[in-house]
Amino acid sequence: MQALLAAPLAKAEELNPLLPHAIEIVLSLVVFGLLLFAVWKFVTPRFEQIYTERTQAIEGGLAAAETKQAEADAKLADLEQQLSEARHEAARIREEAREQGAQIIAEMREQAQADAARIVEHGKTQIEAERQQAVTSLRAEVGTLATSLAGRIVGESLEDDDRSARVVERFLADLETIEASQAAGGGES
């Protein structure tokens, strides 16, 4: 009976659908090897080439970006330096303009003071000249009037010019002395 039972069991083992046949295993291994060889020989190098190209492109892009960034930083620093220099130049120009303005104002003030002093001096000179002219004119007129009045009062003719000139000069000198003493006395009180 064992033989009877062993025969169906051996046949059942042979027909087990879960276990593949040996030929299928061998054929699958050959196809897998061919497929592995094709992938290793053709696909992998292409993947490596594409990977290398992309890596180089990315690294080149990064290098270019770093170069551009360095150029941009250099340009920015240059522009900031130029801006700083322009600000310093503008401040220097403003300071020079302020100094020149102050100098011009001082020169104009000095010139105005000199002009005012010159005008005052000219006015004083002109007034002094007019005063001298008036004094001279008054002396001549006062002398003539005083001589004729004195002649009428005294009843004598004072026609002698030398004598009348001396009398007039003495009279005017006395007047000036009186005037000077009054001015000195009036200034003290």
Swiss-Prot record:
Q: Which Gene3D superfamilies match?
A: F1F0 ATP synthase subunit B, membrane domain (1.20.5.620)
Q: Where in the cell is it found?
A: Cell membrane
- Supply the CDD domains for this chain: ATP-synt_Fo_b (cd06503)
Q: What is its main location?
A: membrane
GO MF annotation, one: proton-transporting ATP synthase activity, rotational mechanism
- Report the InterPro entries cross-referenced here: ATP_synth_B-like_membr_sf, ATP_synth_b/b'su_bac/chlpt, ATP_synth_F0_bsu_bac, ATP_synthase_B_chain
Enumerate the UniProt keywords alphabetically.
ATP synthesis, Cell membrane, CF(0), Hydrogen ion transport, Ion transport, Membrane, Transmembrane, Transmembrane helix, Transport
User: Any idea what job this protein has?
Assistant: F(1)F(0) ATP synthase produces ATP from ADP in the presence of a proton or sodium gradient. F-type ATPases consist of two structural domains, F(1) containing the extramembraneous catalytic core and F(0) containing the membrane proton channel, linked together by a central stalk and a peripheral stalk. During catalysis, ATP synthesis in the catalytic domain of F(1) is coupled via a rotary mechanism of the central stalk subunits to proton translocation. Component of the F(0) channel, it forms part of the peripheral stalk, linking F(1) to F(0).
UniProt similarity note: Belongs to the ATPase B chain family.
Description of how the protein assembles with itself and partners: F-type ATPases have 2 components, F(1) - the catalytic core - and F(0) - the membrane proton channel. F(1) has five subunits: alpha(3), beta(3), gamma(1), delta(1), epsilon(1). F(0) has three main subunits: a(1), b(2) and c(10-14). The alpha and beta chains form an alternating ring which encloses part of the gamma chain. F(1) is attached to F(0) by a central stalk formed by the gamma and epsilon chains, while a peripheral stalk is formed by the delta and b chains.
What's the protein here called?
Answer: ATP synthase subunit b
Native organism is Nocardioides sp. (strain ATCC BAA-499 / JS614)
Gene name on record? atpF
